Curated annotation (Swiss-Prot):
Keywords: Aminoacyl-tRNA synthetase, ATP-binding, Cytoplasm, Ligase, Metal-binding, Nucleotide-binding, Protein biosynthesis, Zinc. Binds 1 zinc ion per subunit. GO terms for biological process: methionyl-tRNA aminoacylation. This is Methionine--tRNA ligase. Zn(2+) binds at C143, C146, C156, C159. Monomer. The lineage of its organism: Bacteria, Bacillati, Actinomycetota, Actinomycetes, Micromonosporales.
Length: 600
């Protein structure tokens, strides 16, 4: 058993999350974490709500509330959404905890001591009409690199390059449309050029990454520039240096503090577990965690922060760049093993947009449909390696033709026939298994290797496809063997054998699909007469801040129980009851209903 870190991108707490968000960071990470636990690994899956930065401050000002009040509101909404989806976080926390502030400031101070954070005078944007600072994200213009006309002041979403507002052509304020003025201001910069060598060495060893992620990351190293990590802002983590700590107008930039959340969440989890040093088993590069792999899950717009910025912070804190230096009190820490990036999900051919009502929020989806229906769609048709379009017609088809008519039908008819004719798991005919019986059982057993290998390589579309092939083979077997035709007493042993084989394959297929469809997996486990926890679920707990701050909700859970990644022989004679359908067949009218909602 090894320790495995599953670090999941932090959803921003300025509103509810839509299904496009969870298709990138949520479901893929949970599938991976559940599979790794089922194979015996000690997984630590962490994340939380990202609660600092300009968008929250601007929105709070517009609503007449404090940034903390706004973050509190949406933190609870997001926690409820992710709980409803069954995402199995060991800890889902937030970036406004005092623990997080302390860890962020420790990394900042350590990098500053090592010379990888340096002060620099730069040009900052202000609003001519109000005199207030204009944050990068609220300035748009033409990208000087690719010509994209809606590039933000911090990043171009078209070419992916990081930018400064002053570099934009024809910059405009997104708040009121005016042209910003640029004035001198002092900030701290991350000296990325001094860390380029160690980053390149590390990326050269990442041969197993998705090609687009690795190629994009290496290209970023060709022209690395120092990057500002503080901002003229009132809402954020204070700068932990003499003369700066008490300044109300300067804060650490949100992208710097958010990626450190993976570490601070791990430390918080350890403190809450009663072993404050336990986090080192997943992080320490010199001790017991030196061989622990770390997998980072996100959408493609966050690649740069995980393949360049975060490794640079870890390397700089450890003193591993061209300036050398000494590790801080947290010690040397592991760089990411793999950055697992998903592409974008669109909706009915358009980009998700709350303002244009091109959106379906997770909470609204879960009010009308089952969580596993969405999880299935994301797994089988999500944006794993290409931008993918969510349409209600395709969602309906996948649900009714595959989930209900394929998997649900196999479960229902196998258990129904066994319950009706035997009332229990039937025995195998003493005469033995036929070639057809053996062949189907072999297909199911082979699925554990095939599906598991694909999940381990983050090929989840192929993985669930292999699992559904087992389902299709079992349905074909039942149709060919036709146990319902074996009505005589002499045929009863053969009927029992067919149904025993079918039920065994249902059990095996259920295990193969458990990482993808945990809610239904638990139900099917119970329909097969199983007891106890098959697919453990997260719980929402209200906790006190460990260092005296306000209380807040977290997602956590006990995932040490549950199924293992193996075929478990069914117990002959275990009672079976007539099953109720596991999946809901959806009426075709939902397509027009949902499209009407989009039209507003």
């Amino acid at each position: 058993m090894s320790h495995v870190l599953a670090a999941v991108a932090w959803p921003y707490a300025n509103g509810p999350r839509h299904i496009g968000h969870v298709s990138g960071f949520g479901v893929p990470s949970d599938v991976f974490a559940r599979y790794m636990r089922m194979t015996g690994h000690d997984v630590l899956m962490v994340s939380g709500t990202d609660e600092h930065g300009t968008p929250i401050q601007v929105q709070a000002d517009a609503e007449g509330v404090t940034p903390r009040e706004l973050a509190d509101r949406y933190n609870r909404v997001i926690v409820a959404d992710l709980h409803g989806l069954g995402l199995s976080y060991d800890l889902f926390t937030r970036t406004t905890t005092r623990n997080h502030y302390a860890v962020v400031q420790e990394l900042f101070e350590g990098m500053y001591r090592n010379g990888y954070i340096v002060p620099k005078t730069t040009m900052g944007a202000i609003s001519p009409s109000t005199g207030r600072t204009l944050p990068d994200r609220y300035i748009e213009g033409t990208c000087p690199i690719c010509g994209y006309e809606s590039a933000r002041g911090d990043q171009c979403d078209s070419c992916g390059n990081q930018l400064d507002p002053i570099d934009l052509r024809n910059p405009k304020s997104k708040i009121n449309g005016e042209t910003p003025e640029f004035i001198e201001t002092e900030h701290f910069f991350l000296d990325l050029p001094a860390l380029a060598g160690v980053l390149r060495q590390w990326l050269d060893t990442r041969e197993g990454w998705r090609p687009n992620v690795l190629r994009f990351s290496k290209n970023l190293l060709d022209d690395l520039q120092p990057r500002a990590i503080t901002r003229d802002l009132e809402w954020g983590v204070p700068i932990p240096l003499e003369g700066w700590r008490d300044r109300g107008d300067k804060r650490i930039y949100v992208w710097f503090d958010a990626v450190i959340g993976y570490l601070s969440a791990s430390i918080e989890w350890a403190r809450r577990s009663g072993d404050p040093e336990a986090w080192r088993r997943w992080w320490s590069a010199d001790g017991q965690g030196k061989d622990a792999p770390g997998y980072y899950f996100m959408g493609k717009d966050n690649i740069v922060f995980h393949s360049v910025i975060w490794p640079a912070l870890l390397a700089g804190y450890s003193g591993e760049g061209s300036r050398d230096g000494q590790p801080g009190e947290l010690g040397r820490m592991n760089l990411p093993t793999e950055v697992v990036s998903s592409e974008f999900l669109t909706m009915e051919g358009r980009k998700f947009s709350s303002s244009r009502r091109v959106v379906i929020y997770v909470r609204d989806f879960l009010e009308r449909y089952d969580a596993d229906a969405l999880r299935y769609f994301i797994a089988v048709a999500g944006p794993e390696s290409n931008d993918t379009d969510f349409t209600w017609a395709e969602f309906l088809r996948r649900n009714n033709d595959e989930l209900v008519a394929g998997w649900g039908n196999l479960v229902n008819r196998s258990i129904s026939m066994a319950a009706k004719n035997f009332g229990a798991i039937p025995p195998v005919d003493p005469a033995g298994l036929t070639e057809a019986d053996e062949a189907l059982l072999a297909v199911a057993r082979a699925g554990f290797g095939a599906v598991g290998e694909l999940i381990g390589r983050h090929r989840q579309k192929q993985a669930i496809g292999e699992a559904m092939k087992v389902v299709a083979e079992a349905n074909r077997y039942l149709s060919e063997q036709a146990p319902w035709k074996l009505k005589s007493e002499a045929d009863r042993p053969r009927m029992g054998t067919i149904l025993h084989v079918a039920l065994q394959v249902v059990s095996d297929a259920n295990t193969l699909l458990t990482p993808f469809l945990p809610h239904s997996a638990q139900k099917i486990h119970e329909l097969l007469g199983g007891t106890g926890v098959h697919a453990p679920m997260p719980v929402v707990e209200e906790v006190e801040d460990l260092d005296g701050g306000p209380a807040y909700p977290v997602l956590t859970g006990d995932y040490s129980v549950g199924a293992r990644w193996e075929s478990v022989p069914l117990e002959v004679g275990r009672p079976l009851d007539p099953p109720k359908p596991v999946f809901r067949k959806l009426d075709p009218s939902i397509v027009d209903e949902e499209l009407a909602r989009l039209a507003g």
